Amino acid sequence: MLKPLGDRVVIRVAKEEEKTVGGIVLASVAKEKPQTGEVIAVGEGRVLENGTKVPMEVKIGDTVMFEKYSGTEVKYEGVEYLIVSAKDIIATVE
């Protein structure tokens, strides 16, 4: 399993829509990049200059929204993930 370092979070990104609400099939260039996904793994948190560790605000299983062009896409054991910094996560979805 992927184990992120520091304040990084591993996210399994939600699938993008293949069709519009009206049923029109979208070309791959016309699709919006998904901005939501499920947290798969979290790092231990950011360490401040004084040595204090800032705890992570998200946990495994959370559904989160993140900034559109953030993170690094990786493929691990045939599954695509996004690794982002905690600061790029903008909300949790309940």
From Swiss-Prot:
Keyword terms: Chaperone, Cytoplasm
NCBIfam families: PRK00364.2-2 (NF001531), PRK00364.2-4 (NF001533), PRK00364.2-5 (NF001534)
Listed name of the protein: Co-chaperonin GroES
Compartment(s): Cytoplasm
CDD domains: cpn10
SMART domains to which the protein is assigned, alphabetical: Cpn10
Primary location class: cytoplasm
Organismal lineage: Bacteria, Bacillati, Bacillota, Bacilli, Lactobacillales
Native source organism of the sequence: Enterococcus faecalis (strain ATCC 700802 / V583)
Entries under SUPFAM superfamilies matching the protein: GroES-like
GO biological process, one term: chaperone cofactor-dependent protein refolding
Family annotation (HAMAP family): CH10
Subunit structure: Heptamer of 7 subunits arranged in a ring. Interacts with the chaperonin GroEL.
Function field: Together with the chaperonin GroEL, plays an essential role in assisting protein folding. The GroEL-GroES system forms a nano-cage that allows encapsulation of the non-native substrate proteins and provides a physical environment optimized to promote and accelerate protein folding. GroES binds to the apical surface of the GroEL ring, thereby capping the opening of the GroEL channel.
GO cellular component: cytoplasm
Gene Ontology MF annotations: ATP binding; metal ion binding; protein folding chaperone; protein-folding chaperone binding; unfolded protein binding
Family designation: Belongs to the GroES chaperonin family.
